[in-house]
Curated annotation (Swiss-Prot):
Its main location: cytoplasm. This is Prefoldin subunit alpha. Molecular chaperone capable of stabilizing a range of proteins. Seems to fulfill an ATP-independent, HSP70-like function in archaeal de novo protein folding. The lineage of its organism: Archaea, Thermoproteota, Thermoprotei, Desulfurococcales, Desulfurococcaceae. Heterohexamer of two alpha and four beta subunits. It comes from Aeropyrum pernix (strain ATCC 700893 / DSM 11879 / JCM 9820 / NBRC 100138 / K1).
Amino acid sequence: MAQQMPSPEEIAAQLQMIRDQIAELQGVLAQLELRLRSVQAAKETVEKAAGQDGETLFPGDPELNTILKARLLEPGKAIVHLGLNVYAKLDTAKATEILAKKEDALKRSLETLKQELDKLSRTHDQYLQLLQALTAGQAAQQAGQQQKQGS
């Protein structure tokens, strides 16, 4: 039994679903990239604080709109978010290690999602080509029928 070719309307609907998935995935990627930059900035701050004693300057935000002059109350210590709203005061080496693991996990997640986005983009392109071929074929068929009727 021959498989019936999907209609242009069905392919267009599939294309829209793929576009929606691509847009959603791009949003998730943007959020993960923001989280990655945040973790990287936190790691850099902890690394900088590790060797400081007394007053030092710290960035107030990633874009350096503000720089804060601060005195470390406990040099060599950092309070790090462990997840689920749990924080721990750790030595800076352990804090840096935890942040590095978070950074690696985010990078792996980003890579996986980018691969998925590439796959979806290729699928989108294939569906688009199929839709264009079908609509071109239908247009040619209609033109042929009109010529027959005109003769």
